[in-house]
């Protein structure tokens, strides 16, 4: 067992019964020229987030924590996105951007395309799990719940983009399914103004989970000798 400093209080977990979840670190969300950028969201501060996620992933992997990577998106015909009968059709900023800019049709969040791919700096390794997801929550229409339960995993450490959308949505759904969710705040970034990040973290630490940092996570899961060297 290890104890992680967090807000509103420290949380204790067993690394072998935990997973680090990397949410949607795709070009769409973290790169210039990706969906968020083209839709008018600021992605200029994502590079430190990428670096922090890379650090957290390395520490988690060394500690024997399962790494799960999510990629948000749909088939290139957008059947999986839902038609006018789906609220996703009306609220997805990717779909709205393509309707407003027809020349982008088939490029944003389409499986197999650059936008859908994980950023170059973050590469899954053998033993990791990579899951596609069609909506904001990683629990919706995916095998995430069964994959976690079959491994006895109850604690989920969250990183990724966007804090106030897919990260928070997945953590909230996990809360309702009796998972303990922790967000590493400096390994996340919001879609929208800074207050969206603050509001999401407030919601999480007050109602749905815990908030910590990459440095505290690495110290908590690293052997004492490695922690001292770091």
UniProtKB/Swiss-Prot annotation:
Alphabetical list of Pfam families matching this protein: Isochorismatase (PF00857)
Gene3D superfamilies, per the entry: Isochorismatase-like
Disulfide bridge partners, by residue number: none
Catalysed conversion reaction: (Z)-3-ureidoacrylate + H2O + H(+) = (Z)-3-aminoacrylate + NH4(+) + CO2; (Z)-3-ureidoacrylate + H2O = (Z)-3-aminoacrylate + carbamate + H(+); (Z)-2-methylureidoacrylate + H2O + H(+) = (Z)-2-methylaminoacrylate + NH4(+) + CO2
InterPro entries recorded: Isochorismatase-like_dom, Isochorismatase-like_hydrls, Isochorismatase-like_sf, RutB
SUPFAM superfamilies (alphabetical): Isochorismatase-like hydrolases
Keyword Glycoprotein: no
Enzyme Commission number(s) from the entry: 3.5.1.110
MF annotations from Gene Ontology: hydrolase activity, acting on carbon-nitrogen (but not peptide) bonds, in linear amides
Record family assignment: Belongs to the isochorismatase family. RutB subfamily.
HAMAP family, per database record: RutB (MF_00830)
NCBIfam families xref list: RutB
Protein's recorded name: Ureidoacrylate amidohydrolase RutB
Source organism of the structure: Enterobacter sp. (strain 638)
């Amino acid at each position: 067992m290890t104890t992680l400093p967090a807000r509103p209080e420290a949380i204790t977990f067993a690394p072998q019964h935990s997973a680090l979840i990397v949410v949607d670190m795709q070009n769409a969300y973290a790169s210039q020229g990706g969906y968020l950028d083209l839709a008018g969201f600021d992605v200029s501060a994502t590079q430190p987030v990428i670096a922090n996620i890379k650090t957290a992933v390395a520490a988690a992997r060394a500690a024997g924590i399962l790494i799960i990577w999510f990629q948000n998106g749909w088939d290139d015909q957008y059947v999986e996105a839902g038609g006018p009968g789906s609220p996703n059709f009306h609220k997805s900023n990717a779909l709205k951007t393509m309707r407003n800019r027809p020349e982008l049709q088939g490029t944003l969040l389409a499986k197999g395309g650059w936008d859908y791919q994980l950023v170059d700096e973050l590469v899954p390794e053998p033993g990791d799990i990579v899951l596609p997801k069609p909506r904001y929550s990683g629990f919706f229409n995916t095998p995430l719940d069964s994959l976690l339960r079959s491994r006895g995993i109850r604690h989920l450490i969250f990183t990724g983009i966007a804090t106030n959308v897919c990260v928070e949505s997945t953590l909230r759904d996990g809360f309702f399914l009796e998972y303990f969710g922790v967000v590493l705040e400096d390994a996340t970034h919001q879609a929208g103004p800074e207050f969206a990040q603050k509001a999401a973290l407030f919601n999480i630490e007050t109602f749905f989970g815990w908030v910590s940092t990459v440095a505290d996570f690495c110290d908590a899961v690293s052997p004492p000798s490695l922690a001292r060297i770091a």
